[in-house]
Amino acid sequence: MRRVVRYLSVVVAITLMLTAESVSIATAAVPPLQPIPGVASVSPANGAVVGVAHPVVVTFTTPVTDRRAVERSIRISTPHNTTGHFEWVASNVVRWVPHRYWPPHTRVSVGVQELTEGFETGDALIGVASISAHTFTVSRNGEVLRTMPASLGKPSRPTPIGSFHAMSKERTVVMDSRTIGIPLNSSDGYLLTAHYAVRVTWSGVYVHSAPWSVNSQGYANVSHGCINLSPDNAAWYFDAVTVGDPIEVVG
Protein backbone atom coordinates (compact mmCIF):
# COMPACT_ATOMS: atom_id res chain seq x y z
CA MET A 1 0.00 0.00 0.00
CA ARG A 2 2.85 2.38 0.84
CA ARG A 3 4.39 1.67 -2.57
CA VAL A 4 1.11 2.59 -4.28
CA VAL A 5 0.83 5.84 -2.32
CA ARG A 6 4.48 6.67 -3.04
CA TYR A 7 3.92 5.93 -6.76
CA LEU A 8 0.83 8.14 -6.90
CA SER A 9 2.67 10.96 -5.14
CA VAL A 10 5.48 10.82 -7.70
CA VAL A 11 2.97 10.84 -10.61
CA VAL A 12 1.13 13.85 -9.16
CA ALA A 13 4.39 15.73 -8.60
CA ILE A 14 5.58 15.09 -12.15
CA THR A 15 2.19 16.12 -13.55
CA LEU A 16 2.27 19.38 -11.61
CA MET A 17 5.81 20.11 -12.80
CA LEU A 18 4.88 19.47 -16.43
CA THR A 19 1.74 21.59 -16.13
CA ALA A 20 3.65 24.48 -14.60
CA GLU A 21 6.33 24.19 -17.28
CA SER A 22 3.68 24.17 -20.04
CA VAL A 23 2.04 27.27 -18.63
CA SER A 24 5.41 28.99 -18.42
CA ILE A 25 6.24 28.10 -22.04
CA ALA A 26 2.80 29.18 -23.26
CA THR A 27 3.08 32.45 -21.39
CA ALA A 28 6.52 33.13 -22.81
CA ALA A 29 5.25 32.48 -26.35
CA VAL A 30 2.75 35.38 -26.18
CA PRO A 31 4.52 38.68 -26.97
CA PRO A 32 3.76 41.52 -24.60
CA LEU A 33 1.38 44.20 -25.85
CA GLN A 34 3.19 47.27 -27.17
CA PRO A 35 1.85 50.57 -25.86
CA ILE A 36 0.49 52.96 -28.48
CA PRO A 37 2.41 56.27 -28.44
CA GLY A 38 0.63 59.51 -27.72
CA VAL A 39 -0.66 61.76 -30.49
CA ALA A 40 1.50 64.78 -31.33
CA SER A 41 -0.76 66.26 -34.03
CA VAL A 42 -3.63 65.58 -36.41
CA SER A 43 -3.99 67.24 -39.81
CA PRO A 44 -6.17 68.83 -41.14
CA ALA A 45 -6.67 70.93 -38.04
CA ASN A 46 -9.95 70.71 -36.20
CA GLY A 47 -12.53 72.88 -37.99
CA ALA A 48 -10.39 73.47 -41.10
CA VAL A 49 -11.84 73.66 -44.62
CA VAL A 50 -9.60 71.84 -47.12
CA GLY A 51 -9.56 70.42 -50.63
CA VAL A 52 -11.15 67.10 -51.49
CA ALA A 53 -7.81 65.28 -51.83
CA HIS A 54 -6.38 66.19 -48.42
CA PRO A 55 -5.27 63.07 -46.48
CA VAL A 56 -5.73 62.66 -42.74
CA VAL A 57 -2.22 62.80 -41.24
CA VAL A 58 -1.54 61.61 -37.68
CA THR A 59 1.85 62.23 -36.09
CA PHE A 60 2.77 60.33 -32.91
CA THR A 61 5.19 61.38 -30.19
CA THR A 62 7.51 58.39 -30.71
CA PRO A 63 8.09 55.71 -33.39
CA VAL A 64 5.28 53.18 -33.70
CA THR A 65 6.13 49.48 -33.26
CA ASP A 66 2.64 48.00 -33.67
CA ARG A 67 1.27 49.67 -36.79
CA ARG A 68 -1.84 47.52 -37.02
CA ALA A 69 -2.87 48.40 -33.48
CA VAL A 70 -2.40 52.07 -34.25
CA GLU A 71 -4.42 51.81 -37.47
CA ARG A 72 -7.23 50.15 -35.53
CA SER A 73 -7.23 53.08 -33.11
CA ILE A 74 -7.90 55.61 -35.90
CA ARG A 75 -11.52 56.15 -36.88
CA ILE A 76 -12.51 58.04 -40.04
CA SER A 77 -16.16 58.62 -40.87
CA THR A 78 -18.22 60.67 -43.32
CA PRO A 79 -21.93 60.71 -44.20
CA HIS A 80 -20.96 59.04 -47.49
CA ASN A 81 -18.87 56.24 -45.90
CA THR A 82 -15.80 57.21 -47.92
CA THR A 83 -13.27 54.37 -48.18
CA GLY A 84 -9.50 54.74 -48.07
CA HIS A 85 -6.22 53.20 -46.95
CA PHE A 86 -3.29 53.83 -44.62
CA GLU A 87 0.18 54.89 -45.76
CA TRP A 88 3.13 55.13 -43.36
CA VAL A 89 5.37 58.02 -44.41
CA ALA A 90 7.68 57.86 -41.37
CA SER A 91 8.13 55.67 -38.30
CA ASN A 92 5.83 57.96 -36.33
CA VAL A 93 3.63 59.39 -39.11
CA VAL A 94 0.69 57.67 -40.81
CA ARG A 95 -1.79 59.11 -43.24
CA TRP A 96 -5.21 57.89 -44.30
CA VAL A 97 -5.88 58.57 -47.97
CA PRO A 98 -9.36 58.39 -49.55
CA HIS A 99 -9.46 55.96 -52.47
CA ARG A 100 -10.73 58.66 -54.79
CA TYR A 101 -11.57 62.05 -53.32
CA TRP A 102 -13.73 63.22 -50.45
CA PRO A 103 -17.15 64.41 -51.61
CA PRO A 104 -17.23 68.22 -51.77
CA HIS A 105 -18.77 70.09 -48.84
CA THR A 106 -18.59 67.08 -46.53
CA ARG A 107 -17.91 66.86 -42.80
CA VAL A 108 -15.16 64.36 -41.98
CA SER A 109 -14.92 63.05 -38.40
CA VAL A 110 -11.53 61.86 -37.14
CA GLY A 111 -11.08 59.87 -33.94
CA VAL A 112 -7.63 58.96 -32.63
CA GLN A 113 -7.40 57.36 -29.20
CA GLU A 114 -9.28 59.78 -26.91
CA LEU A 115 -9.24 62.62 -29.46
CA THR A 116 -12.24 63.39 -31.66
CA GLU A 117 -11.78 66.09 -34.28
CA GLY A 118 -13.16 66.96 -37.67
CA PHE A 119 -12.79 69.09 -40.77
CA GLU A 120 -14.79 70.01 -43.85
CA THR A 121 -14.12 69.87 -47.57
CA GLY A 122 -14.80 72.72 -49.96
CA ASP A 123 -15.44 72.68 -53.69
CA ALA A 124 -13.87 70.02 -55.88
CA LEU A 125 -11.28 72.31 -57.50
CA ILE A 126 -9.13 70.02 -59.65
CA GLY A 127 -6.06 71.01 -61.65
CA VAL A 128 -4.95 68.71 -64.48
CA ALA A 129 -1.51 69.19 -66.05
CA SER A 130 -1.05 67.54 -69.45
CA ILE A 131 2.53 66.77 -70.42
CA SER A 132 1.73 66.17 -74.10
CA ALA A 133 -0.76 69.05 -74.53
CA HIS A 134 1.37 71.53 -72.51
CA THR A 135 -1.68 72.74 -70.60
CA PHE A 136 -2.96 73.15 -67.06
CA THR A 137 -6.75 72.91 -66.83
CA VAL A 138 -8.66 73.87 -63.70
CA SER A 139 -12.26 72.83 -63.04
CA ARG A 140 -14.61 73.44 -60.14
CA ASN A 141 -17.25 70.82 -59.39
CA GLY A 142 -16.95 69.46 -62.92
CA GLU A 143 -17.07 72.81 -64.74
CA VAL A 144 -13.89 73.91 -66.56
CA LEU A 145 -12.86 77.37 -65.35
CA ARG A 146 -9.66 77.91 -67.30
CA THR A 147 -7.26 76.02 -69.58
CA MET A 148 -3.82 77.62 -69.40
CA PRO A 149 -0.68 77.18 -71.49
CA ALA A 150 1.96 75.44 -69.38
CA SER A 151 5.47 74.11 -69.58
CA LEU A 152 6.30 70.97 -67.63
CA GLY A 153 9.52 69.04 -67.00
CA LYS A 154 11.91 68.52 -69.87
CA PRO A 155 12.88 64.92 -70.80
CA SER A 156 15.91 64.91 -68.49
CA ARG A 157 13.84 66.26 -65.56
CA PRO A 158 10.28 65.01 -66.18
CA THR A 159 7.32 66.04 -64.09
CA PRO A 160 6.09 62.96 -62.18
CA ILE A 161 2.84 61.49 -63.48
CA GLY A 162 0.14 60.72 -60.93
CA SER A 163 -2.40 62.16 -58.51
CA PHE A 164 -1.20 64.73 -55.99
CA HIS A 165 -2.68 67.55 -53.94
CA ALA A 166 -1.80 71.12 -53.12
CA MET A 167 0.42 70.73 -50.06
CA SER A 168 1.03 74.41 -49.32
CA LYS A 169 0.84 77.87 -50.84
CA GLU A 170 3.88 80.15 -50.80
CA ARG A 171 3.71 83.68 -52.18
CA THR A 172 7.43 83.52 -52.89
CA VAL A 173 9.84 80.61 -52.74
CA VAL A 174 13.58 80.42 -53.40
CA MET A 175 14.43 77.63 -55.83
CA ASP A 176 17.97 76.30 -55.65
CA SER A 177 19.13 73.62 -58.10
CA ARG A 178 21.52 72.25 -55.48
CA THR A 179 18.54 70.79 -53.59
CA ILE A 180 17.98 68.36 -56.49
CA GLY A 181 21.66 67.63 -57.05
CA ILE A 182 22.50 70.21 -59.73
CA PRO A 183 25.48 72.48 -58.91
CA LEU A 184 24.96 76.19 -59.46
CA ASN A 185 27.89 76.28 -61.87
CA SER A 186 26.26 73.64 -64.07
CA SER A 187 24.62 74.68 -67.33
CA ASP A 188 21.39 73.41 -65.71
CA GLY A 189 22.00 75.19 -62.40
CA TYR A 190 19.71 77.91 -61.06
CA LEU A 191 19.03 80.04 -58.00
CA LEU A 192 15.89 82.11 -58.36
CA THR A 193 12.80 83.38 -56.60
CA ALA A 194 9.47 82.09 -57.90
CA HIS A 195 6.12 83.70 -57.15
CA TYR A 196 2.64 82.25 -56.63
CA ALA A 197 4.06 78.83 -55.77
CA VAL A 198 1.77 75.91 -54.94
CA ARG A 199 3.68 72.87 -53.66
CA VAL A 200 2.85 69.56 -55.35
CA THR A 201 5.51 67.23 -53.86
CA TRP A 202 8.02 67.31 -51.00
CA SER A 203 10.78 66.77 -53.58
CA GLY A 204 10.26 70.30 -54.87
CA VAL A 205 7.66 70.18 -57.64
CA TYR A 206 5.48 73.32 -57.69
CA VAL A 207 2.91 75.03 -59.85
CA HIS A 208 4.35 78.54 -60.09
CA SER A 209 4.82 81.71 -62.07
CA ALA A 210 7.63 81.38 -64.63
CA PRO A 211 7.95 84.52 -66.79
CA TRP A 212 11.21 83.15 -68.22
CA SER A 213 9.41 80.25 -69.94
CA VAL A 214 6.31 82.06 -71.25
CA ASN A 215 7.43 81.61 -74.87
CA SER A 216 7.59 77.82 -74.32
CA GLN A 217 4.33 77.51 -72.39
CA GLY A 218 1.76 75.72 -74.50
CA TYR A 219 4.45 74.48 -76.91
CA ALA A 220 7.36 72.77 -75.15
CA ASN A 221 8.36 71.28 -71.80
CA VAL A 222 11.49 73.05 -70.57
CA SER A 223 11.24 73.13 -66.75
CA HIS A 224 13.17 71.08 -64.18
CA GLY A 225 9.96 69.28 -63.19
CA CYS A 226 7.71 72.11 -62.06
CA ILE A 227 4.51 73.20 -63.78
CA ASN A 228 5.31 76.63 -65.24
CA LEU A 229 2.54 79.18 -65.82
CA SER A 230 2.51 82.81 -66.89
CA PRO A 231 2.47 85.36 -64.03
CA ASP A 232 -1.21 86.20 -64.57
CA ASN A 233 -2.32 82.55 -64.76
CA ALA A 234 -0.18 81.58 -61.76
CA ALA A 235 -1.68 84.41 -59.69
CA TRP A 236 -5.20 83.35 -60.70
CA TYR A 237 -4.61 79.72 -59.70
CA PHE A 238 -2.86 80.74 -56.47
CA ASP A 239 -5.91 82.74 -55.43
CA ALA A 240 -8.34 79.96 -56.41
CA VAL A 241 -6.60 76.91 -54.92
CA THR A 242 -7.00 75.60 -51.38
CA VAL A 243 -4.55 73.30 -49.60
CA GLY A 244 -5.75 69.77 -50.31
CA ASP A 245 -7.13 70.48 -53.78
CA PRO A 246 -6.28 67.71 -56.28
CA ILE A 247 -3.50 68.18 -58.82
CA GLU A 248 -3.30 65.48 -61.48
CA VAL A 249 -0.43 65.07 -63.94
CA VAL A 250 -1.21 63.07 -67.08
CA GLY A 251 0.94 62.01 -70.04
From Swiss-Prot:
Broad enzyme group: transferase
Q: Which residues form the L,D-TPase catalytic domain?
A: 125-250
User: Which GO molecular function entries does the Swiss-Prot or TrEMBL record give?
Assistant: acyltransferase activity; peptidoglycan L,D-transpeptidase activity
The cellular component terms of Gene Ontology attached to this UniProt record, alphabetical and capped at eight, are: extracellular region; periplasmic space
Gene Ontology biological process terms in this record = cell wall organization; peptidoglycan-protein cross-linking; regulation of cell shape
Q: Record-annotated residues binding substrate? A: 190, 203-204, 228
Q: Which residues bind imipenem?
A: 208, 224, 226, 228
What switches on expression, per the entry, is described as: Up-regulated 17-fold under nutrient starvation.
> According to its UniProt record, where is this protein mainly located?
periplasm
Q: Which UniProt keywords apply?
A: Acyltransferase, Cell shape, Cell wall biogenesis/degradation, Peptidoglycan synthesis, Periplasm, Signal, Transferase
The residues that cross the membrane are: none
The regulatory note on its activity is: Is irreversibly inactivated by the beta-lactams carbapenems via the formation of a covalent adduct resulting from acylation of the catalytic Cys; ertapenem and imipenem are the most efficient drugs for in vitro LdtMt1 inactivation. Cephalosporins (cefotaxime, cephalothin, and ceftriaxone) also form covalent adducts with LdtMt1, although the acylation reaction was 7- to 1,000-fold slower and leads to elimination of one of the drug side chains. A high drug concentration (360 uM) of ceftriaxone is required for full inhibition of enzyme activity. Is not inhibited by ampicillin.
Query: How is the quaternary structure described?
Result: Monomer.
Task performed by this protein: Generates 3->3 cross-links in peptidoglycan, catalyzing the cleavage of the mDap(3)-D-Ala(4) bond of a tetrapeptide donor stem and the formation of a bond between the carbonyl of mDap(3) of the donor stem and the side chain of mDap(3) of the acceptor stem. Is specific for donor substrates containing a stem tetrapeptide since it cannot use pentapeptide stems. Is thought to play a role in adaptation to the nonreplicative state of M.tuberculosis.
**The name this protein goes by in its record:** L,D-transpeptidase 1
